[in-house]
Amino acid sequence: RSEISHCLPTMLDAARQVAGNEYQIIVAAAPGVEDAFYQPFIQGEILTRDTYKVLTEAKAAIVNSGTATLEAALIGCPQTAVYYIAGSKYLEKLLRPIIFSIPNFTLVNIILQGQVIQELIASRFTTENVAHELQRLLYDQEYRKNMLKQYQQLYTILGDTSAANNAADKIYTLISNCDETNQ
């Protein structure tokens, strides 16, 4: 709930700036969080629990970093990932060397070993940055096409069956290799 309270207002402000009358904003509710919790944030947007259907039909998504980024990629939805760090102004200053030395935070970027989707984390998670990235996702056809093309590599890496196990194995291998190079 805290994560939703911190992230959703910025996500919605950015989406409202970009959507205008051209796009409908849909909020996919998190499992276990009742609809009433979302009401103070929603101003005419649609609230749904059918996340997969929304991602299938969406032209673009703003996704809170986590497994949802991988799900959106496997569905084929262009996205940007956001993540709020509580006390981020102070924590970021303290943890900056660690936070920004990690090349990728999202599962998509970790598995594909590159910056496929934009990660707006800590102080980079602002309404302006999210709106800018959302505009790129919606209107820059080359950018969208490239992202979707890179998503196809996920199927090769993860395979057609046991995607979750393959993803876990790949992430474990990458983390193990990272630990070995840092020792």
Where are these regions (language model features)?
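Nucleotide-activated sugar donor-binding and catalytic core shared by glycosyltransferases
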Residues: R1-Q183
